[in-house]
């Protein structure tokens, strides 16, 4: 399967479910810690859907988080109206009551990154079913979820991926994610090709940003090929087989009527007042967009650097801490950008580790920059130290690593002169090029000196010594 995809028009809408960090579940006092607990220990009659079990009123923190999320996505909050919890009926082993409780919208008609937000609401997570062994763990049952339903405005897999990355960054800024952040998405996609509009297909329970991207890439090709052969894209629900990176038909597409929504008679509706919304707004943190704007204005960095820094809350906070510790001026800001946004980020990506788990803190970078400014280490050695910090999970400070490994800048002038003369002797072609006016040959010779000294030479002094000998 393949071919040119430029002639295919894609429409995609996402239903995104994000677990939020509350101590207790949405409708009972059971712990939400299902990852570390023994199976079926953090449960009660409400979690297990036992007859006669009465749910508590909705978890207040979960409602407040839903309001915050809706506000940050530009939604209008549904105020002074009853917000009901409904029973959404379907049969599956992880749903002991036979229905899932889900609220009517808390926020509507928003926009984020140019993608329309249809609604934001709360719902409870079902349990965890393992079909391979036929066992169910209900510890997760009742954990609060935020569901964000987008409009079908997404036009490409790449746009979907970027949207989800920025959305998860938003949740991290709110500080409401459980652990590293658990996200699942139902992906709705249809295409138009050769003048034919295909039916909408839903792919259920895709549990990663990468998965959503792969689903859309696969479905674009699959649906295009069906239309190309004169067939009809079926309106259906499909499953994502992550191990094979393909989708597989599950059943015909459900409608709202299939779920038999009814208001839950055991839960009183909630009403959000304007006063409550204002109180929540006062507690809301700075958004990534606002932080990016402030970094550009306050520190004078360019927009691309600011965008990269604020895409990771830990990195943004480290940048500010480093700059304030060193003193806010252009030199220190530039150094902080270089060693955090460029070098530390490079090392983290290479070693496939996130900043928050790397053990590298602001004080490590502050000490590293001071060693550079004081001429104790060269730029090349500083890059090695960054890698060592990541590898060793920040267990040792830069100064300690430099002393242990003998990485300080060479102060012995005779040793430096010897390395310079050796580089000149071993590279006659570069010497000839320099004497013929090719100034870049000087940089090559400097690189040879740095290689001979294992990066411990002072580049400025090396250039001076090279010129003294070559310009005679």
Swiss-Prot record:
- Please give the superkingdom of this protein's source: Archaea
**What is the species listed in this Swiss-Prot or TrEMBL entry?**
Methanocaldococcus jannaschii (strain ATCC 43067 / DSM 2661 / JAL-1 / JCM 10045 / NBRC 100440) (Methanococcus jannaschii)
Biological function? Allows the formation of correctly charged Asn-tRNA(Asn) or Gln-tRNA(Gln) through the transamidation of misacylated Asp-tRNA(Asn) or Glu-tRNA(Gln) in organisms which lack either or both of asparaginyl-tRNA or glutaminyl-tRNA synthetases. The reaction takes place in the presence of glutamine and ATP through an activated phospho-Asp-tRNA(Asn) or phospho-Glu-tRNA(Gln).
Q: Which GO terms describe its molecular function?
A: asparaginyl-tRNA synthase (glutamine-hydrolyzing) activity; ATP binding; glutaminyl-tRNA synthase (glutamine-hydrolyzing) activity
The record's annotation in SUPFAM superfamilies points to:
GatB/YqeY motif (SSF89095), Glutamine synthetase/guanido kinase (SSF55931)
UniProt entry tagged with the keyword Repeat: no
InterPro entries on file: Asn/Gln-tRNA_amidoTrfase_suB/E, Asn/Gln-tRNA_Trfase_suB/E_cat, Asn/Gln_amidotransferase, Asn/Gln_tRNA_amidoTrase-B-like, GatB, GatB_C_1, GatB_Yqey_C_2, Gln-tRNA_amidoTrfase_suB_CS
Query: Could you give the subunit structure recorded for this chain?
Result: Heterotrimer of A, B and C subunits.
Q: Name one Pfam family in it.
A: GatB_N
Alphabetized, the UniProt keywords read: ATP-binding, Ligase, Nucleotide-binding, Protein biosynthesis
Under what name is this protein listed? Aspartyl/glutamyl-tRNA(Asn/Gln) amidotransferase subunit B
Q: Which GO terms describe its biological process?
A: glutaminyl-tRNAGln biosynthesis via transamidation; translation
Q: What is its EC number?
A: 6.3.5.-
Which reactions appear under catalytic activity for this entry?
L-glutamyl-tRNA(Gln) + L-glutamine + ATP + H2O = L-glutaminyl-tRNA(Gln) + L-glutamate + ADP + phosphate + H(+); L-aspartyl-tRNA(Asn) + L-glutamine + ATP + H2O = L-asparaginyl-tRNA(Asn) + L-glutamate + ADP + phosphate + 2 H(+)
Q: Which family does it belong to?
A: Belongs to the GatB/GatE family. GatB subfamily.
